[in-house]
């Protein structure tokens, strides 16, 4: 369910904000995927599927990435008034 548009924000501004947020999320996902893949998957593929070690590594990597991303977000928004 979408959030209501904040008071004083036009629909065009809200659309622009949503578009910026979507671009940020896509970039975040791409960086996460690239970082964890490079860290956890061997450069020379031996099997078509991820092995158990690679699976565990990717799981931990993604978990840590999201945890740090949340911490950074909280720190950045700590001094800002709510929108």
Curated annotation (Swiss-Prot):
* N-acetylalanine: residues bearing it: 2
Disulfide pairs here are 36-61, 40-57
Kindly list the GO molecular function terms attached to this UniProt entry. metal ion binding
Q: What keywords were assigned to this record?
A: Acetylation, Chaperone, Disulfide bond, Metal-binding, Mitochondrion, Protein transport, Translocation, Transport, Zinc
Motif Twin CX3C motif: which residue numbers? 36-61
Keyword Magnesium tagged: no
Q: Which SUPFAM superfamilies match?
A: Tim10-like (SSF144122)
Q: What is its main location?
A: mitochondrion
Q: Which Gene3D superfamilies match?
A: Mitochondrial import inner membrane translocase subunit tim13 like domains
Q: Which tissues is it found in, per the record?
A: Expressed in roots, flowers, young cotyledons and leaves.
Cellular localisation: Mitochondrion intermembrane space
Q: Sorted alphabetically, which InterPro entries does this protein's record hold? A: Tim10-like, Tim10-like_dom_sf
Q: Which Pfam families match?
A: zf-Tim10_DDP
Q: What is one Gene Ontology biological process annotated in the Swiss-Prot or TrEMBL record? A: protein insertion into mitochondrial inner membrane
**GO CC term (a single one):** mitochondrial intermembrane space
Q: What is known of its domains?
A: The twin CX3C motif contains 4 conserved Cys residues that form 2 disulfide bonds in the mitochondrial intermembrane space. However, during the transit of TIM10 from cytoplasm into mitochondrion, the Cys residues probably coordinate zinc, thereby preventing folding and allowing its transfer across mitochondrial outer membrane.
Its assembly, as annotated, is: Heterohexamer; composed of 3 copies of TIM9 and 3 copies of TIM10, named soluble 70 kDa complex. The complex associates with the TIM22 component of the TIM22 complex. Interacts with multi-pass transmembrane proteins in transit.
Q: Which family does it belong to?
A: Belongs to the small Tim family.
Q: What does this protein do?
A: Mitochondrial intermembrane chaperone that participates in the import and insertion of multi-pass transmembrane proteins into the mitochondrial inner membrane. May also be required for the transfer of beta-barrel precursors from the TOM complex to the sorting and assembly machinery (SAM complex) of the outer membrane. Acts as a chaperone-like protein that protects the hydrophobic precursors from aggregation and guide them through the mitochondrial intermembrane space.
**What name goes with this protein?**
Mitochondrial import inner membrane translocase subunit TIM10
UniProt organism field: Arabidopsis thaliana
Q: What is the lineage of its organism?
A: Eukaryota, Viridiplantae, Streptophyta, Embryophyta, Tracheophyta
């Amino acid at each position: 369910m979408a959030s209501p548009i904040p008071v004083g924000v036009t629909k065009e501004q809200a659309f622009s904000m949503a578009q910026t947020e979507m671009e940020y999320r896509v970039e975040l996902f791409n960086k996460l995927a690239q970082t964890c893949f490079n860290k956890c998957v061997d450069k020379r593929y031996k099997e078509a599927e991820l092995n158990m070690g690679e699976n565990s590594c990717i799981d931990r990597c993604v978990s840590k990435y999201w945890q740090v991303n949340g911490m950074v977000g909280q720190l950045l928004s700590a001094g800002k008034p709510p929108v």
